[in-house]
A protein has these predicted regions:
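Conserved hydrophobic/aromatic beta-strand scaffold that supports enzyme active sites
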Residues: 199, 213-217, 224, 242-246, ...
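Alpha-helical interface subdomain recognition
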Residues: 23-28, 40-43, 65, 69-161, ...
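A short, Trp-centered hydrophobic/proline-enriched beta-strand micro-motif
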Residues: 194-202
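Intrinsically disordered, low-complexity segments enriched in small polar residues
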Residues: 4-14, 21-30, 34, 39-42, ...
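A short core secondary-structure module
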Residues: 223-224, 228-271
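Short glycine/proline-enriched turns and hinge-like loops at secondary-structure junctions
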Residues: 142-143, 210-212, 236-240, 254-257, ...
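Flexible, small-/acidic-enriched active-site or ligand-binding loops
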Residues: 213, 268-296
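Short Gly/Pro-enriched turn/cap motifs at secondary-structure boundaries
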Residues: 191, 206-209, 233-236, 250-252, ...
């Protein structure tokens, strides 16, 4: 019986049958695909997730499930106790699917720096873009922990593909939480179906962390607004069909003068340039320019002057999934390193027998597991109609998980020695991809400012 992804309205899309070999390989990327297959029976042989959902109840935040045995899929990953049966089934299904349909393209996507259309279409086949969209608007309405699992499992094999799923959700969050019902009904079903992609245009060349310093303008003209300005570091620039753009309707009011708009690409948005990035090379990042673009007033999100509040509200709810992406990158590096250590021989045996290297692997796993727990806690808070605590825990989850991903991938390169420094093996890609998780959606230095402020506020 073929499984379907939970919360996707009974989709009958099947996961590809297990087709990967399990022997050793001289190719680093081949080694990754062969040695990281689950040791448990193929999820393709299990009952459908629709049946599992009926038996176990609907997908729910992780905290609602009592503890079960640890390390279900092996000794490296130990947070299964926090997941419901449905969430574990979803994770296992998506893990195999990602290894079979996403991982084979990951190195080429990184090398060519081209958008991973093949991987994106594979995600659409499983209706993954629908995961974070409410059911009332054609989505799956999945809880945030399940969305974090998606980000993690995709990032475990290809962080660029993971970001393609996260960015449209980020772009649609202002519409979901602040937009009119007309905007929701027009755009959300198309994003959920993978027919549209969305971008989030907040940063500018001289207004990254200091959002209130933005210079983009929006001037009312009858039933329209005229938008002018440039936005930098825009994920999916040129690929997305719609862009959430923040601009000042009152240039002297600082942050209180910012307003949010939903702008279609064909209305006059242009991409001035794409960046040649260190990592996440399959996810285009560019400068988006608006030169007197006319936007209907009906496409304003929220009221005039609410833009700063909308931006911060959105990032609070998105940062935990950036933490999940970072955890996925770290987990991919751990899994690859562990497999490599068992196959690589030196001093008369596998290097996995060397205590010093075992200690490194243990530290990597401990840090990653702690990050995962913090990410899941922050994600559960999103589902709890959160108070100020989400700002604190969202910042903590993002900062801690991204620092963890960076330290773990550095150690993974070290464990592979000279091989880790070459592009024949994936750990250097993991390292390059991990770096940006410390930067985007608020640098970790800014996150620490937020964390300290929130702690002192309640002291």
């Amino acid at each position: 019986m073929q499984p379907s992804i939970p919360g996707t309205r009974g989709s009958k899309n099947s996961v590809a049958q297990r087709a990967l070999t399990t022997g050793s390989s001289s190719s680093g990327e081949g080694l990754m695909r062969s040695t990281l297959e689950p040791s448990a029976p193929s999820c393709c042989e299990s009952a459908s997730l629709r049946e599992v959902t009926s038996a176990a109840g609907p997908i729910a935040p992780a905290r609602s499930e009592p503890p079960s045995r640890l390390c279900e899929n092996g000794p490296v990953e130990a947070s299964n106790f926090a997941l419901t049966d449905v969430q574990r089934q979803f994770r296992d299904t998506l893990r195999q699917y990602a290894e079979e349909r996403i991982a084979p393209q990951a190195a080429e996507v990184d090398r060519t720096a081209e958008f991973p259309w093949k991987s994106f279409k594979a995600c659409v086949e499983l209706e993954l873009p629908a995961l974070g969209i409410p059911e009332a608007y054609g989505g799956a309405g999945a809880d945030m922990v399940t969305q974090a699992i998606m980000a993690e499992e995709l990032a475990r094999v290809c962080a660029s593909t993971s970001l393609t799923m996260l960015i449209s959700k980020l772009g649609m969050l202002p519409v979901m939480n602040w937009g009119s019902d007309e905007l929701r009904r027009h755009y959300l079903p198309k994003v959920a179906a993978g027919e549209m992609q969305a971008s989030y245009c907040l940063s500018e060349a001289d207004a990254g962390s200091d959002v209130a310093a933005m210079k983009s303008r929006a001037v009312r003209d009858g039933d329209d607004y005229i938008l002018t300005g440039s936005k930098y570091w825009i994920t999916n620039a040129g690929i997305s069909d719609v862009y959430v753009v923040f601009a000042k309707t009152d240039p002297v009011a600082g942050g209180r003068g910012i307003t949010c708009f939903l702008v279609e690409r064909d209305w006059g948005i242009t991409v001035a340039k794409h960046e040649d990035k260190m990592g996440l090379r399959g996810s285009p990042t560019g400068e988006v320019t608006l030169n007197e673009v006319r936007v209907p007033a009906s496409h304003r999100i929220g009221a005039e002057g609410q833009g700063f509040t909308i931006a911060m509200h959105t990032l609070d709810r998105s940062r935990p999934t950036i933490g999940a992406q970072a955890v996925g990158i770290a987990q991919g590096a751990i899994d690859y390193s562990a497999s490599y250590m068992k196959q690589r021989h030196a001093f008369g045996g596998p290097i996995a027998d060397l205590q010093g290297l075992r200690f490194m692997l243990a530290d990597m796993a401990m840090r990653t597991e702690a990050a995962r727990a913090l990410v899941y806690r922050a994600c559960a808070m999103v589902d709890d109609d959160p108070s100020d605590e989400l700002t604190l825990f969202g910042a903590m989850a993002k900062a801690f998980a991204s620092d963890t991903a960076m330290s773990v991938t550095v150690d993974a390169v070290q464990l592979l020695g000279g091989y880790g420094y070459t592009r024949d093996f994936p750990v250097e890609r993991f390292l390059r991809d991990a770096k940006v998780t410390q930067i985007y959606e608020g640098t970790n230095q800014v996150q620490k400012v937020v964390i300290a402020r929130e702690i002192l506020k309640h002291a």
